[in-house]
Regions:
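Flavin-dependent oxidoreductase catalytic cores
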Residues: 1-403, 407, 411-418, 451, ...
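Short beta-alpha connecting loops at secondary-structure transitions
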Residues: 270-276, 322, 438, 443-458, ...
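Terminal amphipathic helices with adjacent charged low-complexity linkers/tails
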Residues: 196, 434-437, 441, 500-507
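N-terminal Rossmann-like dinucleotide/flavin-binding domain of flavoprotein oxidoreductases
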Residues: 437-498, 587-614, 619-620, 634
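Flexible inter-domain linker/hinge segments
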Residues: 351-352, 370-396, 703-737
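Short acidic loop-to-helix transition motifs that present clustered carboxylates
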Residues: 307-309, 331, 487-490, 538-540, ...
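Rossmann-like dinucleotide/flavin-binding elements
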Residues: 394-430, 483-494, 504-588, 627-639, ...
Length: 737
């Protein structure tokens, strides 16, 4: 049962003509390829949040017109009545659980890509986008402005038609209304430029027209970056135009959705802050000024990767917010509110702040939303997965051995346990659960010095929540046994007595420097030597680096740069080389890149991009420019760290697979391999693979993934029977539970 301390979180809150059932608010967030083109995906993704207790559930950004097309990134759309019909399925599903549905109306101005529509962009100025190369817009004159505001009204009416309860005018993150408000963009000399009142005019008039059109039936919200964090003449700050704008249009809105930052450069990361640089509730000093200092009496929602129920209570009681806003925490655990309500705090699957969900949006196109913690996100409709409901396996009378307790093995064991397999034994050769997470979570710690910024280097400790959640789940499952310090050979597996065997033994770094740039060993590389090392050896202290260190980073993500950050903070002279044009480019997609590069520069790390390691000699590394291979440079070093290719630890699996007769004699009817033991990948991939295999352990061949529903247009045929059957099965499982 709910602890009375948290009662305040479950109070209803009025938003204009609507009443939210509680204070949990899923703010607008992207979902990969959901949009309005895949109503099944969209409705079940958002509906799962409502079922999990989120009192308000919103779309992603929702385009109002073809002049605001973000392809290949996927937004929802309300261009016409067909879009409204598709999004009505989402509204109906949210309403099934008594929650409110919100639509975030969006026009990107000159930030729009228009790659699909090919329409000419339109904005407050004729000038280039600071975000996308080659994006220019035509100047919006007075007639254009009236036309654009009409598009907002048309979309708002369609939103009401679809069944939305809350209708946004989205402006935060440098969208069109902010392009008018911010002096960084707005250099106009007419009634829409110059003074604050003129710069605010477009946004104010748009709110007036939307409110007049649908305000009697729908709550009117607007999303504002109270501080663009650009300062001076390049943006605005909370102490000037941020507060002033709230007071200027407060009478027109029913709810304020407050955030910070922009999309210029890496500044979106100041809002969707990665955990290694920004802590929980990191926006408080900015967004907290609005309600706490009485600049509005309207309900306020805000975010900050808030996962701790006690922090939530403090936020409400201090009047920082009226709603606990969440994007990433609601992705990691759609049932977070219900778990608080039912007193199951230890079962909350906390967001780790890795921002793989954000990266899945940046990949664009058909990419589904992905989460390291929650393998079921985005799979609610197409695979029929529910994050809290697991059907008993048809072969549940069988015993299962899971070898390896890294992310894939832990997840597989948890899901198998919840599917009521008779006996699941999880065996791990080390003394702790977690696999590679045991050294990854120690990465990146800096010197503790003040960076001079609002962010600090905090390391990857919060990624340990992947292990923490699964360790708690394993302890609750009586049909799952965990055995640590329990290495196994192929012979041990054959003698163990299990009927199904899952190998999840992870991966290791290549010792010869094999890498993605050359797909071959590097002359002179041998990390078994004392003066050469792999990343885990540095982090765990197995090897002690010398003063001069060169890191060769071929992974393009967090490992190489984190080693550089850690060693530089300890006083080492660090050079990091990468064959890629941008150092750790995937970190741009996770919004960590800007923070990381700032910190590496602060620490004095030398960065060499588009550089390959040609040869390693005692005391020296020879590098070359990838475009001019003959242009080599010799670096004097004491230690070389190779963040190169990884190799699966699949020896036990391959030996067992080569002995089919012995498997049959041992009574092993199924042998499977998952995670990095199958193919090295990211943590999210290992968790997903372990989950999928366990979900499908009773299929004909669990190694061959079952087909999933593909929402698509079929020429000359409209047949929803398969989709409807899938939903019937999902709903039946919910009712049975």
């Amino acid at each position: 049962m709910r602890d009375s301390r948290y009662d305040v979180l479950f109070e209803p809150v009025r938003i204009g003509p609507k009443v939210a059932p509680n204070r949990f608010y899923q703010v607008p967030h992207c979902a990969g390829s959901a949009g309005s083109e895949q109503p099944g995906f969209q409705s079940e993704l958002r509906g799962m949040k409502a079922q999990g207790g989120w009192g308000v559930v919103c779309t992603e950004y929702c385009s109002i017109h073809p002049t605001s097309d973000d392809s290949p990134y996927v937004s929802a759309r309300l261009w016409d009545d067909d879009d409204a019909a598709n999004l009505s399925v989402m509204c109906d599903r949210i309403h099934d659980f008594g929650s409110l549905a919100g639509a975030e109306l969006w026009h990107g101005g000159f930030q729009s890509k228009n790659s699909e529509s090919r329409h000419v962009r339109i904005g407050p100025l004729q000038g280039p986008s600071d975000l996308y190369v080659g994006n220019y817009a035509r100047y919006a004159d007075a007639e254009d402005i009236v036309m654009i505001q009409g598009w907002y009204v048309d979309a708002a009416i369609r939103a009401r038609q679809a069944g939305f309860d809350v209708v946004y005018v989205y402006a935060a993150h440098n969208e069109l209304p902010t392009q008018f408000l911010s002096p960084f963009f707005n250099h106009r000399h007419d009634q829409y430029g110059g003074s604050f009142e003129n710069r605010a005019r477009f946004w104010r008039e748009t709110l007036e027209k939307v409110k007049e059109a649908v305000g009697d039936d729908c709550a009117i919200a607007t999303r504002l970056s109270v501080d663009t964090l650009q300062g001076g003449k390049t943006g605005y700050q909370v102490g000037d135009d941020g507060i002033r704008f709230v007071e200027h249009v407060d009478h027109l809105v029913d709810l304020w959705d407050l955030t910070i930052g922009s999309t210029s450069g890496a500044e979106w990361g100041n809002d969707a802050g990665p955990s290694r640089f920004l802590q929980e509730n990191h926006e408080k000093d900015y967004v907290g000024q609005i309600k706490m200092h009485n600049h509005t009496d309207k309900p306020v929602v805000g975010v900050g990767r808030i996962t701790n129920p006690d922090t939530m209570v403090e936020i409400i009681k201090s009047r920082q917010f009226d709603f606990i806003g969440a994007a990433r925490p609601s992705i990691a655990d759609p049932f977070l509110p219900k778990k608080i309500d039912e007193g199951r705090l230890d079962e909350i699957r906390e967001c780790i702040g890795c921002n793989q969900c954000v990266a899945s949006h940046h990949l664009g196109g058909a990419t589904h939303i992905q989460c390291t913690q929650n393998a079921t996100i985005g799979e609610e409709y197409r695979r029929g997965w529910h994050p809290e409901i697991f059907t008993p396996a048809r072969n549940r009378d069988m015993s299962v051995l899971v070898l390896g307790a890294g992310p894939a093995g832990m997840e597989a064991a948890v899901v198998l346990g919840k599917r009521q397999m008779e006996a699941v034994h999880l065996r791990e050769q080390n003394a702790t659960l977690g696999g590679a997470l045991n050294w990854i979570t120690k990465l990146g710690y800096s010197d503790g010095a003040d960076t001079g910024e609002r962010w600090q280097n905090r390391g990857l400790a919060e990624w340990g929540r992947v292990t923490d959640y699964r360790e708690i789940q394993l302890a609750k499952l009586s049909n799952v046994e965990t055995h640590l310090n329990a290495p196994m050979t192929a012979a041990d597996v054959l003698d163990y007595g299990a009927e199904l065997v899952i190998i999840a033994t992870g991966a290791r770094y290549a010792t010869d420097g094999t890498n993605a740039a050359t797909h071959a060993p590097i002359p002179g590389v041998d990390t078994t030597l004392d003066w050469q090392a792999t990343p885990p050896e540095i982090v765990t202290g197995t090897k002690t680096p010398g003063q001069r260190v060169l890191i060769y980073d071929c992974e393009d993500y967090f490992v190489g740069v984190s080693i550089a950050q850690m060693l530089a903070s300890q006083g080492h002279d660090v050079t990091i080389a990468t064959p890629h044009a941008v150092l750790a480019e995937h970190m741009n997609s996770t919004l960590e890149g800007g923070f990381m590069r700032r910190d590496l520069r602060r620490l004095g790390v030398r960065i060499l991009t588009e550089t390959t390691v040609e040869e390693v000699r005692p005391g020296a590394v020879i590098t070359s420019d990838i475009w001019q291979p003959k242009a080599t440079e010799e670096h004097q070093v004491d230690t070389v760290v190779m963040a190169s290719a990884r190799v699966s630890n699949d020896g036990v699996y391959r030996e067992l697979r080569s002995r089919p007769d012995d498997l049959a004699e041992a009574g092993i009817s199924g042998l499977y391999v998952v995670g990095s033991a199958n193919a090295p990948g990211m943590i999210k991939d290992s968790v997903f693979q372990g989950h999928r295999l366990a979900r499908e352990i009773d299929s004909e061949d669990p190694m061959d993934p079952l087909p999933f529903i593909r929402e698509r247009r079929l020429w000359g045929r409209v047949d929803n029977s398969r989709y409807e059957a899938a939903l019937d099965g999902l709903y039946a499982a919910e009712q049975a539970t």
